Amino acid sequence: MDKIALIGDVHANLTALEAVLEDIEKRNISKIYCLGDIVSKSVNPDIVIDIIKEKCDVILKGNCDEIFSSERALTRQFWTRMKIGEKRAKFLRELPIMHEFYLSGKLIRLFHASPYSLEHIYNPEYNNHDKRYNNKIIINPMELFKNTDFIGKSKNDKIPDVIGYAHLHMPIIFKVEDKIIFNTGSVGASYNKGEATYTIVEGELNSQKNMNMSISNVSVYYNLEKEIKYIEESDIPTKDDIIAYLKN
């Protein structure tokens, strides 16, 4: 059986990423897929990008990766944009949107947020009442399985059996009709203080034969004070906001 670790929303949190990678290594997992949002929030985006490039077999683009790598980055994004430099920014801009593969006969499709954009959001826990996303809220979970131009799919392409996404920062796994949806939670910006989450899928990789497979979410605690020290010692102008976010 093959094991794949799926991580997302690292958000430049080096301490959390190191803790997760250590946990993945202890579990003898050799394949790691990243579902985007490598940068933003914390203060080591350059180091985190380099580690992700080295360790991950698949890397997808998140909404923050797109925004913070832009040559038109706004003032609040400028610190990160300067920190990562043009070479890393170009790497982020050129990341793919979607990845899919067979595991034990199931077609698994991965993206950062949705088949519509890098910002649309589906949140089953809170009835999707989030004013930040305005008209980018997905109500019906089956919409996550749609084939769209945004992810390079046509109506004639096979509909996946499993959807894995990030963006939400909340680890979830549930069935809808005959399908499965899971969210990786967040490595670097979890809603639980000092906790990083990721997902493990296990089965026969690249096999279209129906066999046993499993999906599980994992929580790892990291040294929050160490990450806060990184932030305090930096010259990022939004350090107070970042520390408050990580602590609360």
Predicted features along the sequence, with ranges:
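Active-site-proximal beta-strand elements of phosphoester/diester hydrolases
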Residues: 2-11, 107-114, 181-185
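Active-site-proximal loop/helix segment associated with metal-binding centers of metalloenzymes
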Residues: 113-150
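Active-site environment of divalent metal-dependent phosphoester hydrolases
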Residues: 11-16, 40-43, 64-70, 116-117, ...
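Hydrophobic, aromatic-enriched interface-forming segments
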Residues: 137-144, 150-169, 173-176
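Acidic, His/Gly-rich catalytic cores of divalent-metal-dependent hydrolytic chemistry
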Residues: 173-248
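Core catalytic region of metal-dependent phosphoesterases/phosphodiesterases
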Residues: 2-93
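Glycine-rich phosphate-binding loop signature in dinucleotide/nucleotide-binding domains
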Residues: 24-29, 103, 155-159, 200
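Short acidic-hydrophobic surface loop/beta-edge motif
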Residues: 97-105, 174-176
